[in-house]
Amino acid sequence: MAFHGKDDVLDIKAQAHVWKIIYGFADSLVLRCAVELGIVDIIDNNNQPMALADLASKLPVSDVNCDNLYRILRYLVKMEILRVEKSDDGQKKYALEPIATLLSRNAKRSMVPMILGMTQKDFMTPWHSMKDGLSDNGTAFEKAMGMTIWEYLEGHPDQSQLFNEGMAGETRLLTSSLISGSRDMFQGIDSLVDVGGGNGTTVKAISDAFPHIKCTLFDLPHVIANSYDLPNIERIGGDMFKSVPSAQAIILKLILHDWNDEDSIKILKQCRNAVPKDGGKVIIVDVALDEESDHELSSTRLILDIDMLVNTGGKERTKEVWEKIVKSAGFSGCKIRHIAAIQSVIEVFP
């Protein structure tokens, strides 16, 4: 191919950029393939880098074509999940990059359930209906699946468990940053309810870090039924739109971004009724968007916003929107603090 000037070079770069966007799903599904094959765990359990043939012999599939596997591994190297090292005899061997610790099934902060859950076919299908979700009468998920995401999860126990395990993995990463970056926020609190707390990962971490706090896990009855049986933590099933157990503090971690502003205000009003006017607070852990920021996490936050648009009808919010819905729910105001996470802490006061 002959280039005839700057415009041709720019055109090729533009084409390459669009091709990369078109095949953006390749990253997700190559990652899923690697998880299904257990590539990270196989290399990790080997305790040293592995040659192509050795790795092929350990895979849970028969008749592995080593050239096909090589191409998958080459892509994982490009994704910075694996790296290539050469042995003394010049043989290529594959080792794990630091990010791979999140891709091990047995890792404390494993993202494997989230990867498997978000890339399974039923959760990919609604993305094809994104344009149908632009109206006010249902999300893309509802248009594609004929039900809300919550109805789907309630009717598909295996997917619900995978979803909650995925959220638990996310929670371990987030809660560590929450506690280390906001210890002062929990001082003086004697009781706390984790609303929509899933299997109890967050409330257990808070209880372990602050044993003086009487902690309660609150979620839908079918979620509570599958939650951990945790010592010193009361478990209550219910509906946060109808009532919330009383406590000095309520925590809503990755909850309100699932709901539109109107529903979020309804939830916040129930939380306001559950905390004392003097000394009470609601702790929201969610993204606080800065639309003008070029921070390295900004693009991830915008991806999460589109995820909410497609699947839940919720949204990630700017500081201004957080202040608006908090006051609409009857609170006096809020304070936003940033922690070492994609999300921020929005501390809300009666």
Swiss-Prot record:
Pathway: Alkaloid biosynthesis; (S)-reticuline biosynthesis; (S)-reticuline from (S)-norcoclaurine: step 4/4. Pfam families: Dimerisation, Methyltransf_2. It comes from the Eukaryota. Keywords: Methyltransferase, S-adenosyl-L-methionine, Transferase. Disulfide bonds: none annotated. It is an enzyme of class 2 (transferase). GO terms for biological process: methylation. Signal peptide: none annotated. It catalyses: (S)-3'-hydroxy-N-methylcoclaurine + S-adenosyl-L-methionine = (S)-reticuline + S-adenosyl-L-homocysteine + H(+). GO terms for molecular function: 3'-hydroxy-N-methyl-(S)-coclaurine 4'-O-methyltransferase activity; O-methyltransferase activity; protein dimerization activity. The active site is at H257. Belongs to the class I-like SAM-binding methyltransferase superfamily. Cation-independent O-methyltransferase family. COMT subfamily. Catalyzes the transfer of the methyl group to the 4'-hydroxyl group of 3'-hydroxy-N-methylcoclaurine to form reticuline. This is 3'-hydroxy-N-methyl-(S)-coclaurine 4'-O-methyltransferase.
